[in-house]
């Protein structure tokens, strides 16, 4: 059944990573959905090395786009969302990357491009939170960026920085395991000061600290089991394993307990009977400030963002509208 025609200027925009997508197929699928919905002609904007999506999305907004389709990896989605934050114009996800982290956490189609595009034109709106990170460098300069899934400092960011792009293209998220193995020999605890929601500052040493708007990673890893993208708070996980056996306990916690046992009533009962793992610490809050003794690698949604001396992260509740299947 063909939808009622929309005003001629009612159109979508597609922000796409030309390296990640099959452009001819994408154009054909969008044209079909656009016609079925009775929309005007879709506008197309490629990303580039200089622009992950922020600038072209602002252009699309200036041109009156009613919905913006993000076709690319996690970096493209993050860039588009950064520009759409608090605009009221929805984003539609066309997963085309390695991790597809936000789509995975929202339980959206990962491999059905036609269904993903259809949601852009006929789906319903879902409002989710956006994490904001202000990053201060060692030279005193600072910059502010959005994140949708996780921001991390320490080991996880170092793993991302060390990931082999060719291996990542060949085996996907498994390339991070190779990077982690290479990062471990030189790994030292990160000494930092932190404050959550304005509480008195505390000092600790961790191997990595992750601030999450969502909790799931590829491979069935549920790092933050209580994280929800629309609960108005950020979840914080600190990994501080004591020796090699500590890393085994960390893996057991996030892969087995969080990823498997929590999915059943019996499994949750087993977790309740076991002692809590001190190598993985959890907290929640709306505002986190942390300063490290020495600059550390920092990442946002799986993309490296250089070294940070301090980070101020907070949540912008309900700031992003996402199109999901009706």
Where are these regions (language model features)?
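ATP/NTP phosphate-donor binding region
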Residues: 1-68, 78, 118
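Short glycine/serine/threonine-rich phosphate/pyrophosphate-binding segments
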Residues: 53, 75-80, 99-101, 128
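Catalytic core of DAGKc-family lipid kinases
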Residues: 47, 85-90, 96-211
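Gly/Ser/Thr-rich active-site loops/lids in small-molecule metabolic enzymes
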Residues: 167-175, 219-220, 225-249
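ATP/nucleoside-binding phosphotransfer catalytic cores, i.e., glycine-rich phosphate-binding loops
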Residues: 2, 196-199, 228-229, 238-326
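A generic structural signal for short beta-strands and their flanking turns/coil linkers
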Residues: 188-190, 205-207, 230-235, 286
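Glycine-rich phosphate/pyrophosphate-binding beta-alpha loops
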Residues: 152, 156, 210-225, 304
